[in-house]
Amino acid sequence: MDTKYLFKRHNTYWVKVAVPKDLRKELGFDLRASLHTHELSEAQKLRDAVVEDFKSQIFAAKASLKNSNGKGAVKTFMPVTDTTDPQYYHKVVDCQYACPAHTPVPEYIRKISQGEYTEAYMINWESNVFPGILGRTCDRPCEPACRRTRTHEKPVAICRLKRVAADFKDDVTELLPKAPKETNGKKIALIGGGPASLTVARDLIVMGYECTLFEKDPQAGGLMRTNIPSFRLPEEVLDAEVDQILNMGLKTKFNSEITSLKNFLKEDFDAVFIGTGAPKGKDLNIEGRKDAEANIHIGIDFLTSIAFEHIDSIGKKVVVLGGGNTAMDCCRSSLRLGAEDVKVVVRSPFSQMKASEWEIEDAMEENIPILENHVPKKFLH
């Protein structure tokens, strides 16, 4: 059966139709139509009919363009969206498409409203692996897309509801998938113990792959462990969700830094996944930088040192340069290390700060002043 031009999304088959290059501007690059069926055989039959109809329209449109030197009107291929039809809002869920993992938001919120927290958690877990972690730290791309903002000041608290499901769920150990008794004989190496490698492990282990994780630090978690302060992400929450994957049968080699990929590829693995992230902070090379080396910390290195307890105190006066989420974590961490006078200095206007709105609010609630439109010129000490 030819399924080349069929794809399935959220239990509905769609048909994709190739568009001639000279018509793409008028018709769009991805021309497709929903077949509204869950059955593959039925989808194939409907596809044939849809393709024939689209072919005739494409030929007519090409003829129209040719006869009018490329300026002819092109017939609309897709029907105009009927937003008065309630079914439209069940098929096109803005927040769900805004989520990089396409988490079925309405489904798990409905479960929470019914008090079914475990079910809500598992719906999340299938999509995003770390509901308890994301419920505390996600950047929330879903919430600006929430339709509630069209009629109310604020969106539904989609992110925090993940945390609700995670905090009130029952023990889900027996609900998590298990590795099959027999593997398929394929060995996969995962370099880096952060969320990317852990997600790959979760998906591959249940398919019978033998996965081995290599991590330079003594624990898995990656930047979730080293760069998110514990007052935002409690260690027990992080450990619980990371352990769910480790306990699926993932082999681990901690304190194992891979320094030569060339040599590593000689190992007995069928495939290698590199999930090392990009843990490199930004320096500020202005006058006096070298002379002030002893008193300067790079943002993510500073947070990592705190996480591993290499730093347990700091001076009384702290200036944080930058207006992103890392800067907000650094200034709040400084207060907890004993600093008495903490300021944040940003180049941009306050309204253009890169940090998430709630991160800025949390810092300001702790009485940390943010000085906008200040450009550092020189380090004095």
What are the residue ranges of the model-derived segments?
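Short, Arg/Lys-rich segments that mark the N-terminal edge of DNA/RNA- and chromatin-recognition modules
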Residues: 1-37, 62-74
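Short arginine-rich
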Residues: 49-62, 130-135
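Ferredoxin-type iron-sulfur electron-transfer modules and their immediate structural context
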Residues: 74-187, 235, 265, 274-293, ...
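Rossmann-like dinucleotide/flavin-binding elements
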Residues: 189-214, 253-262, 280-283, 301-357
